[in-house]
Amino acid sequence: MRSIRSFANDDRHVMVKHSTIYPSPEELEAVQNMVSTVECALKHVSDWMDEKNKSVKCEGDVEAKEEAAESNAKDQSGRTLCGVMRIGLVAKGLLIKDDMDLELVLMCKEKPTKTLLCIVKDNLPIQIQKLTEEKYLVEEHVNEAAIIIRNTKEPKLTLKVILTSPLIRDEAEKKEGDSVAMKDPPDLLDRQKCLEALASLRHAKWFQARANGLKSCVIVLRILRDLCNRVPTWAPLKGWPLELICEKSIGTCNRPLGAGEALRRVMECLASGILLPGGPGLHDPCEREPTDALSDMTVQQKEAITHSAQHALRLSAFGQIYKVLEMDPLPSNKSFQKYSWSVADKEGTGSSALKRPFEDGVGDDKDPNKKMKRNLRKILDSKAIDLMNALMRLNQIRPGLQYKLLSQSGPVHAPVFTMSVDVDGTTYEASGPSKKTAKLHVAVKVLQAMGYPTGFDADVECVSSDEKSDNEGKNETVSSISSNNTGNSTADTSATLEVRTQGPILTASGKNPVMELNEKRRGLKYELISETGGSHDKRFVMEVEVDGQKFRGAGPNKKVAKASAALAALEKLFSGPNAANNKKKKILPQQTKGVVNTAVSAAVQAVRGRGRGALTRGAFVGAAAATGYITPGYGAPYGYSTAAPAYGLPKRMVLLPVMKFPTYPVPHYSFF
């Protein structure tokens, strides 16, 4: 898995390359003016042709002239020219410098003929002169079934207007014998060109619906179109097949992608061999019959593109994407210092920079590890480490460490994970209530053993003290801490939250806030309120509604944001004076007898616990119990301890278990 920093570097190169191939504002304005002018002129040509046809039909017919206005309003489909639509690069927004082919489709009511093409060509310059003072050259190309329009000013632009009709496709799809074939006019335009124009219209509508909304898709398409223009190997893929591949590659990802990562994903798709013979092919979604969009490419062309994509993917993996884009490598956006971190990072005001390359070191000491350790000591002794947890810091010092899960012990409701890591032949172990916490403890041990002040000693002590208090059932300490936190200032609260964000977010009792809130209020729904930032710096805001109140939390991912929202709800509703209102506690009367007093205190401790401790079902006073052991309740999980029913005991049941202690030692693994 590549680091986020490498994707950010790819994003910078791709965006710089995109800025060099994107048309200038003057070029875009010229394109917009030319296309709008021709569209309006074609509308005037259509009106002129309709008026001419009506005047011919209505000569000498007074009644027909009176009904002309009504028929025009009722039957708009009677126009000879039905409409004009944008297709190709103009409709999809894929224009780049030196590749600005402008295309329009002129839809006709009947099958287009050479006569109709000449009429439109002759009248179009007249209508253009009425709209603008700019001069345009209008030419007819019968073989292309189109009219070519060129401007005389800079930048030089060419607009192609293709004539077609829906009747051509309908007739082509009819089977023999279904209907009587209509006679085509003798001067009918090229049928294949008209069909291609209809297909281009479908492609434009599909692209606007599926690809325009994908983040980075249009940018990647412009980059790849420039690649097709520069490299002859990629030329056969240019056009509709390239658009399909980009949409499928980027659209199948479950999250928005940056420009660099999206380009790499397209290259991965091509490098996997989907173009090669025997592969899945490329389905054309705009055709009724199953059609392969790659059918026009030869086997040799497919193999050449696959080989080129694999080479580009290797260059990108080694940080040389600038070679794929044919541009100069960009300088780093952060100035490197003599040490591994910049001055701003030492002061805690910036994020960590890239490591110093080994070849940059100067001195007699040739061991790069010793150089890095010496530099780290100089930095860490002068200032505290910036806001990074021990696991992230260790990964910067020794990247690629493998953490292993040694064991998982404890009951299901209170597991204990033991993780280990091997550093320079020495194995370090640590435990925690979760794998993440155990890994964090291991990282702290390794940093301490290597002689680096971690700044997380207080966190480790807090975690260990919380675990001890949980095991002993001393919830009084937790309640006092929560009450003290309630009385603290806003600055103290924000400082506490900052410390918590270094590692996994846990409640005062050491549990996951989402799990603990779910135990108190089941069936809660978390909603995503907002998602901001780039692909390498996301910011999510989640919201949860508890008892009619809404709580929000933010974080770099949805999991952390949910935990923050749940933690806010717990601190607001289930801590301090609010805890008594939301959760009623039943306190049993104190007894003065020895054994019974011990049993009562144990039951009270269990009731006060945060949920991990098991409540003994117990027997009624006076019930017989076997000597030598504690009477177990039903449902004890795996023999670790006795357990109460899943949904609590009856309210009036006497919670006084009869406990008889043996005269000989009880094995520690039997019931505790």
Curated annotation (Swiss-Prot):
Q: Does the keyword Ribonucleoprotein apply?
A: no
Segments forming domain DRBM? 386-452, 509-575
**Bias type Low complexity, positions:** 477-490
One biological process term in Gene Ontology: spermatogenesis
Compositionally biased tracts (Basic and acidic residues):
356-370, 465-475
Q: Which UniProt keywords apply?
A: Cytoplasm, Developmental protein, Differentiation, DNA-binding, Repeat, RNA-binding, Spermatogenesis
Give all residue intervals belonging to the DZF domain: 5-362
Q: Which residues does the annotated region (Disordered) include?
A: 348-370, 463-494
The subcellular location is: Cytoplasm
Give the InterPro entries listed for this entry. Answer: dsRBD_dom, DZF_dom, DZF_dom_C, DZF_dom_N, NT_sf, STRBP_DSRM_1
Function recorded in the entry: May be involved in normal spermatogenesis and sperm function. Binds to double-stranded DNA and RNA.
State what protein this is by name.
Spermatid perinuclear RNA-binding protein
Q: Which organism is it from?
A: Gallus gallus
